[in-house]
Regions:
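Generic detector of leucine side chains in alpha-helical contexts
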Residues: 12-13, 53, 70, 85-88, ...
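Core catalytic region of metal-dependent phosphoesterases/phosphodiesterases
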Residues: 15, 23-25, 30-123
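Acidic, histidine-bearing metal-coordination/catalytic regions of metal-dependent phosphoesterases
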Residues: 1-44, 186-236
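A short, conserved beta-to-alpha structural element at the edge of catalytic cores
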Residues: 1, 45-60, 90-107, 179-213
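A short linear-motif detector with a strong N-terminal bias
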Residues: 1-4, 46-48, 72-74, 108-109, ...
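Conserved beta-sheet core of the metallophosphoesterase superfamily
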Residues: 110-222, 228
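Short hydrophobic "helix-edge" motifs at membrane interfaces and signal-peptide entry regions
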Residues: 16-18, 87, 143-145
């Protein structure tokens, strides 16, 4: 364990954002060729994609920063994983995604600060669930401004929703994401930190805080509008 442990309570998973920069990301899919077509990533091949993802990462993350990667780190074996990890800045915590499971017993997993199926952390006084998948519901979500957050990946959502492509027998077919219709049911305190949703770059704790605050404000406005509409209907 490195110097970063000074800012990390191992038992309670508490971090102090005034002493260390904290970032979140997910679904980098290093060396995964099909992900370029599936998610319409703007890269010609995996070499170009991997270089961009690593450069974007290191443009915001310094060697002493903390990064929580919420799964589906890379596609491939030890050569791919070790090469990518040797180039990335920061102390990385890995939440396992569905594509990471086969790598659990590999030696390069020790290069992460910690590896887990999920984590529950505090940054300052903010409680945060970290998972690869979005939750339908979770403890602490109904506390208003003090609600716990849940950060996730997996769904490859994008700020400007697009249709995804699937490859079947060499043919490319346009379809809607199987997860897309469900994302509207997320709480305003949930956010997809995956690279496809964040300009292929890790997002900082401060950025996530700003995004979730904005989502909460929108949610509040929508509820107030619904209540006004409901009142108007009842008077007719």
């Amino acid at each position: 364990m490195s110097e970063v442990s000074r800012y990390f309570d191992k038992q309670l998973l508490k971090f102090d954002s005034s002493k260390v920069n904290i970032f979140f990301t997910s679904d980098t899919h290093i060396a995964h060729e099909n992900i370029i077509k599936y998610c319409k990533r703007p890269y010609a091949n995996t070499k170009e994609m991997d270089e961009a993802l690593i450069n974007n990462w290191n443009s915001v993350v310094s060697p002493d920063d903390i990064v929580f990667h919420l799964g589906d780190f890379a596609w491939g074996g030890s050569g791919v994983w070790n090469d990518a990890l040797s180039k990335l800045n920061g102390h990385i915590y890995l939440i396992l995604g569905n594509h990471d499971m086969k790598n659990l017993r590999q030696g390069y997993m020790t290069r992460f600060e910690a590896v887990a199926f999920q984590m529950y952390i505090y940054i300052d006084k903010q409680a945060i669930y970290l998972n690869h998948y979005p939750f339908l519901c979770y403890a602490g979500v109904y506390r208003g401004e003090n609600s716990a957050w849940q950060l996730f990946g997996h769904v490859h959502s994008q700020k400007k929703e697009i249709s995804y492509e699937t490859i079947t027998n060499g043919e490319v077919k346009e379809i809607l994401s199987k997860d897309e219709s469900r994302l509207k049911y997320l709480f305003p305190t949930q956010y997809d930190v995956g690279v496809d949703n964040n300009n292929y770059t890790p997002v900082s704790y401060e950025q996530v805080k700003e995004i979730i605050t904005y989502q909460q404000e929108l949610y509040k406005m929508e509820k107030e509008k619904e209540n006004e509409t409901s009142k108007g209907s009842s008077l007719q």
